[in-house]
């Protein structure tokens, strides 16, 4: 959804702790820190709704021919991928198919694949965002192995806080809420507690 230079800048900030507004000022410091990190990060941008799953597959194959095998793929974001059938189906069916194809791509590449999705209006200022708040097609939730949500109220945004909710975990516990520190100026996100709370715990505290 964002331009490749903006995405790359956010990674620079997250890795080095330099605020986004100061990235150009501390270019040498950033370069010195990042060059010591093993591995590579490839950021590929496509115009909105121009890329389908085959487009991404072709790019991955091109990288493999250059001896770059991805350990993880992040798609920003699945809902904006162009359907293979030209958009003839209802949107909810399109999204379900897109997410199934993303899962298939992860299996082919033998690596984790992450993407994001939007919430509906009920999740805009919710204390905890559950799967019921995920917009458009609920069926895409059935495809995922792991789903977490990030919620931030107006007060959270002022205090650099938030919550992460484990909405689905095919291979482990779910239904847990963890407090977050979240400073968007430097893209710093930290889970503050190793012991999760349930949604009911959060509701009782806020009532």
Regions found by a protein language model. Name each.
Residues 1, 43, 76, 102, ...:
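Conserved RecA-like P-loop NTPase ATPase core
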Residues 2-69, 83, 177-179:
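Cytosolic-facing regulatory segments adjacent to core modules
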Residues 4, 79, 121:
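Short, glycine/acidic-enriched loop or turn micro-motifs at the edges of active sites
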Residues 4, 95, 99, 134-140:
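Amphipathic alpha-helical segments in well-structured domains
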Residues 32, 53-73, 86-89, 107-109, ...:
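C-terminal regions of RecA-like/P-loop NTPase motor modules
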Residues 36-41, 102-113, 143-145:
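A structural motif corresponding to the C-terminal end of an alpha-helix
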Residues 44-46, 75-78, 116-117, 150-151, ...:
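Generic beta-strand/beta-sheet core signal
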Residues 71-115:
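Helical hairpin unit composed of two closely spaced alpha helices linked by a short loop
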